[in-house]
């Protein structure tokens, strides 16, 4: 069985292994390169076609973990290619007119002080669009899944191949809270400043055509956010996208706080699995 979905992901070492509590960082924020690769090993066990963006030094390690499965690894120097936008992010993060709007407890979240973190989080649609434009995607559907999405061994639920008949006329975002209603751009900014999370950034699914639409929308939303002297990770940007084009999206509820239940809720095209997903949806309030 061949999946209808290509998985795209990326990993770049932004120094997160040094974000330890004894250095003043928030508890449980530190993750070394080795930890990230241990998470990736679980995702990499899937036999779906995968396209992975990384730095030149990490390419052999990615290829070794995939071990002959259909894989394309693309190397890129993000520090060089995106140095201007990184500098702009950093300038806003250090601007008191931005930081004074944040609650003190939010100041330790990396989206408010790490330009590398914000940059990498905001490149997901860029990476997918680049892979599509390079002609690397051969399947109808494309899924972005974070390199470190599989924190625990059972996240993929023992699947060998991940496949689900997502509606190709929509982009599919995944939520951990019900009731997202956005009525103004200012409300989106309030969500960003207050760190209100509805949409996760760890998984996004769409057809190749819809990804191109989504990429343009992401770029527009990122520019608006920066021009208003605000920075945020992908979660806030995706809320902005939803506000601007609600017709483009399906919001798929994973369950309250269930960040890592993608493969449980959307695991095959069989009737039984669909019924299981429906039961999960109805039971999670």
Swiss-Prot record:
Induction: Expressed in both exponential and stationary phases.
Disulfide bridges in this chain: none
NCBIfam families (alphabetical): HtrL_YibB, PRK11346.1
Protein name in the entry: Protein HtrL
Name of the gene: htrL
């Amino acid at each position: 069985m061949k999946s209808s979905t290509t998985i795209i992901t990326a990993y770049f070492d932004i120094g997160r292994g040094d974000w330890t509590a004894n250095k003043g960082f928030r508890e449980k924020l530190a993750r070394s390169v080795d930890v990230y690769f241990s998470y990736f090993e679980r995702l990499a066990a899937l036999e779906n076609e995968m396209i992975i963006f990384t730095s030149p030094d990490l390419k052999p390690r990615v290829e070794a973990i995939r071990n002959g499965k259909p894989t394309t690894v693309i190397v890129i120097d993000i520090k060089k290619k995106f140095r201007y936008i990184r500098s702009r992010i950093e300038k806003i993060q250090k601007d008191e007119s931005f930081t004074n709007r944040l609650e003190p407890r939010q100041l330790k979240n990396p989206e408010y002080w790490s330009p590398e973190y914000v940059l990498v989080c905001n490149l997901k649609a860029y990476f997918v669009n680049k892979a599509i434009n390079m002609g690397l995607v051969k399947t109808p559907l494309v899924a972005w899944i974070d390199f470190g999405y599989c924190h625990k061994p059972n996240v993929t639920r023992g699947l060998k191949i991940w496949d689900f008949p997502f509606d190709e006329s929509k982009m599919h975002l995944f939520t951990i809270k019900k009731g997202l209603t956005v009525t103004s751009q200012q409300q989106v900014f309030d969500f960003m400043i207050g760190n209100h999370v509805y949409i996760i950034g760890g998984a996004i699914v769409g057809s190749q055509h819809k990804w191109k639409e989504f990429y343009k929308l992401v770029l527009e939303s990122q520019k608006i956010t920066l021009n208003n002297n605000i920075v945020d990770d992908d979660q806030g940007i995706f809320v902005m996208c939803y506000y601007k084009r609600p017709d483009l999206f399906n919001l798929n509820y994973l369950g309250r706080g269930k960040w890592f239940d993608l493969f449980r809720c959307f695991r095959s095209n069989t009737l039984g699995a669909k019924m299981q997903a429906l039961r999960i949806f109805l039971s999670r309030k």
